[in-house]
């Protein structure tokens, strides 16, 4: 199984240890609700652990793999979930390094009221 497949399976299984293992030590995470990115495996894994708790009924609905730049592989995982009862649609954009680990993760969510609820929910944990 490829690392992209490993990351997806780990998220779907809510396996934080496996998620952490798929992250590069120097990963950069861009949150949909914070201006500054998070840096480093430990910080990003901690935040992803919170998201595993906050998202309800999380499931990926589609997967897109970049074919444009072999030197910078990327994958987009599209998901649906709920946060405090509000429906959320989102996208995890992953970038991979030469070692096959996730070096960049950008999460985008919509609609705005759900993104605001997500920010409140993450802030409570």
Task: Tell what function each PLM region has.
Residues 1-125:
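C-terminal and inter-domain tail/linker signature
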């Amino acid at each position: 199984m490829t690392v992209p497949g490993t990351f997806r399976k780990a998220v779907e299984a809510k396996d934080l240890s496996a998620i952490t293992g798929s992250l590069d030590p120097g990963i950069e995470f861009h949150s949909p609700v914070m201006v500054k990115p998070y840096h480093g495996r430990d910080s990003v894994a901690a935040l992803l652990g919170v998201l595993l708790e906050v998202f309800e009924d999380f499931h990926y609905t589609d997967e897109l793999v970049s074919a444009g730049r072999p030197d910078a592989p990327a994958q987009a995982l599209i998901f649906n979930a709920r946060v405090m009862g509000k429906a959320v649609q989102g996208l995890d954009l992953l970038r991979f390094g030469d070692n096959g680990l996730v070096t960049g993760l950008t999460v985008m969510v919509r609609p705005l009221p759900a993104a605001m609820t997500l920010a409140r929910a993450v802030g409570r944990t």
